[in-house]
């Protein structure tokens, strides 16, 4: 009984990290000051070795919860939250992963097999250096609603499949967008039938919708997170996240056919009429009986907010969480209006920003397909960066 109590007390001290020497307000103030000076407190991944990582990841690679850096049991350790350089190193009254000693990646102290030790964290590596980059191939074949293209031109494109409920096999469900090694962003309305995660499959690196590719990567789904305030009448908050299942912290392997898209900065606002791209395996037009066999791309322009209202969309509800984009070309030279259509839902609307293709929207809804002067409607990604970040945490 005595040993059990000691073990419990040890765990409480290690995990909770009782702090007596600094008032909580001062500790938080120092932490905030250090975060602003030396790194982004909202970061969901680390760059290089992670020395400047100031995010809130707090789980080790083995799944253990990190110990508070201000724990009394760390006082004699080289690195702790009360050392003179603590703020500069990102240490303080928290249990977030850090790299104060220049190790290969962020780490923290944990309890493993009742022993006190340090362990590397499962924080993802930032793909900023390569996100949104591609080997673009100029499309050679035109199609109604867009252009046939190759997956290397849109390596962040995902294809989501669902098991049939009343028969064997599976069916193509929606498009998706790879935003990090283990996470795919998509549209909430794709999951109105409430598929359990084990009935979903994600394919990356595929040019043809149902024909396997040589470099494709296939994953089962660990989690399906639909926005808690998704409105299936108006499609407000039309966003969802899929966590890919893998036996290691790394899921998708980067290649010319598979690469994450860059997420935008929260304050990113591109000029009206900026040309952007969409991609997907959807129908060629509303009356098409089948989805496209090959990936297609479309070229559209961002509409001003004054043109993205119910007035221009047959009195359909348009909220501040939506943006509009459409093909503004017209005349005999451009009889084919580029637009998303059924089956493209959940796919990307991407625009060039700082020499990287960047995700601006998620294909959500529209009035018909390829109708002249009627834009498609997309989920505005900049409004959901906090939601994405919070749900990607372990």
From Swiss-Prot:
Domain Peptidase S1: 143-393
Pfam families according to UniProt: Kringle, Trypsin
Glycan attachment sites: 315
Reported function: Probably essential to support the feeding habits of this exclusively haematophagous animal. Probable potent thrombolytic agent.
UniProt GO cellular component terms: extracellular space
Protein name: Salivary plasminogen activator gamma
PANTHER family found in the cross-reference section: TISSUE-TYPE PLASMINOGEN ACTIVATOR, TRYPSIN-RELATED
Listed Gene3D superfamilies: Plasminogen Kringle 4, Trypsin-like serine proteases
Enzyme Commission code(s) on record: 3.4.21.68
Top-tier EC class: hydrolase
